[in-house]
Amino acid sequence: NNLPQNNKNLNVIKGDVRDLNKLKISLKNHDAVIHLACISNDPSFELNPKLGQEINFDCFEPLVLLSKDLGIKQFIYASSSSVYGVKETAEVTEEASLEPLTDYSKFKAQCESILLSNTNNNFLGTIIRPATVCGYSPRQRLDLVVNILTNLAYHKKIIKVFGGSQLRPNIHISDMVRSYLCVLNADDQKIKNQIFNVGFENYSVEKLALMVQKNIKDKVELQYSKSDDNRSYHINSEKISRLLDFTPQKNINEAIKDLINVFDKKLLSNTLSNQEYFNIKKMQSINLT
């Protein structure tokens, strides 16, 4: 795995989120759960919808109830801004109606309801609705929009733009991590039963492609084609800034530059084909489809 191996404060337990017995042993004497376990995102989920439902939904309520029974104080759930679906509203806040377009986002919305219906003063539930993550990380993904565009532009000098007008909120991976730490350390009354959007830059897919193109030294061609992905939304993240004083420290342009620097230094191998960077390819390689 890509987790730190020599951190005395980190105990890595290999297990399955569906294994309640293992979870019961692992969660004892802990204060908080940050729930990140899921098959992400829509394309990966659709490879094996049955497995996707088991991982993303069926085992969620048992984990929430177990955490509550074990006296865990705080449960932070990583939902998704895709729960909003298509929105014409200029600024989509946390109060907007949920109109998920896919099973992946539908199960995210249902898990939100499950968590909030089980919270009390001794079991605090908080929901994060992240934008799409971008930038370099130890567990690198190159199947997310900004990272896809940067990888293609750098290595093939071509960016394929599917659609173009769809709005896609994004957030740098380092700020995404910071948002979880912010919620984890916040005053109880500020995060109890709260939902927070986390995504401070909302650009169209075409605008993202142009940003990438501008950062590549060589000439990069943009190729346009139709897209079946109609998700489009402009999320407003003012709430987490106002209540928790959270502001991003990095932006999309820095994420692009970070990736280019990594490519220049050849820190990632075979970035167009290495299954480790693409969830679908990884699932196929270990027969999860």
Per-range role (PLM):
Residues 18, 83-84, 133-135, 176, ...:
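Conserved sequence/active-site signature of Rossmann-fold short-chain dehydrogenase/reductase
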Residues 30-36, 77, 197:
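Rossmann-fold scaffold of SDR-type NAD(P)-dependent oxidoreductases
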Residues 113-168, 173-184, 212-214:
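NAD(P)-dependent short-chain dehydrogenase/reductase
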